[in-house]
Swiss-Prot record:
Disulfide bonds: none annotated. Residues 1-31 are annotated as: Disordered. Keywords: Endoplasmic reticulum, Golgi apparatus, Membrane, Phosphoprotein, Transmembrane, Transmembrane helix. The keyword Repeat does not apply. It comes from Schizosaccharomyces pombe (strain 972 / ATCC 24843) (Fission yeast). Its main location: endoplasmic reticulum. It is a multi-pass membrane protein. The chain crosses the membrane at residues 63-83, 85-105. This is Uncharacterized membrane protein C338.18. The keyword Endoplasmic reticulum applies. It is found in: Endoplasmic reticulum membrane; Golgi apparatus membrane. The modification Phosphoserine is found at residue 37.
Length: 117
């Protein structure tokens, strides 16, 4: 054990009225909450809020694109709506929307060219 761990345990035990600290894990290590002060948690939460505030514009835009794509696919046909969904969300749309559609179209062309229907 390092001296720092011993000092942390000693500080935690000194704060506890019974001598057993509620901030220790079962094996005697300091718990996650005891490692960080409340001021550092507050700073991290402020930074997270600032990050989310900047990201919320993107999130709102993504939701609008998703809703428009779903309405378009339900109203004007699945193929064009799913393509617009794929354009709005490329990583998800390419794997789960465009590839199956292209695969189905290619299979249809192969069947038609071979004379089978």
């Amino acid at each position: 054990m390092t001296e720092q761990n011993i000092d942390i345990k000693r500080e935690l035990k000194d704060e506890s009225p019974i001598g057993q600290s509620p901030h220790l894990e079962n094996d005697g290590r300091p718990s996650l909450m005891s490692r960080y002060s409340y001021s550092s948690i507050e700073e991290v939460s402020k930074e997270g809020y600032q990050w989310f505030k900047h990201q919320s514009v993107f999130l709102k835009f993504s939701l609008i694109v998703l809703l428009f794509s779903l309405m378009f696919s339900l109203t004007f046909g699945s193929l064009l709506g799913l393509i617009s969904l794929a354009l709005g969300f490329p990583s998800v749309g390419y794997r789960y929307v465009l590839l199956p559609i292209l695969n189905a179209l290619l299979n249809r062309l192969r069947l038609n060219s071979s004379g089978l229907k």
